[in-house]
Amino acid sequence: MIRKNHSLICLFFLTLLYSCISLGSDELDNAFKQRSIMISSSNQSCSHFVVWLAETRNQQMRGLMYVKNLPQNTGMLFIYPDSKIRAMWMKNTYISLDMIFIDENGIVSSIEKNTEPQSLKTIRSEKPIKYVLELAEGTTDQIKLIEGDHIYW
């Protein structure tokens, strides 16, 4: 019962956030659609973000390349057509990120924290996933996100 009420409250705030927030990065705003997401952490807290959606192959190849500042409570959600092991890199990405690998049910599968800017090192999901969420470095520690937590959109 408490968990159900917690989820309803989180969804209410997600709706409120989506209706009120606007992002300042015109370039990303023009190239990507936006959506609000809510992260429900195991510590019973809800965190709200507005993310750009990388849905097409070209958008996924571009990602957050050349972005020099990621505003607080923003990020990018990569949406793939199917679940499989995914590989990411940081080529031409000037800021360190936390990468969250998410399965088809919205459950956090694994997290790669504090990625190295502009690195060509491959960062792979540990299991088949359908989504990757990129947030500013340190965000996952700040919201106490762990494997098994749930992300809603």
Give each language-model segment a name.
Residues 2-9:
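Bacterial N-terminal signal peptides that target proteins for export
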Residues 7, 19-21, 121:
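Residue-level marker of intrinsically disordered, low-complexity segments enriched
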Residues 10-18:
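Bacterial N-terminal signal peptides
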Residues 23-153:
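Compact, glycine-rich, soluble single-domain proteins
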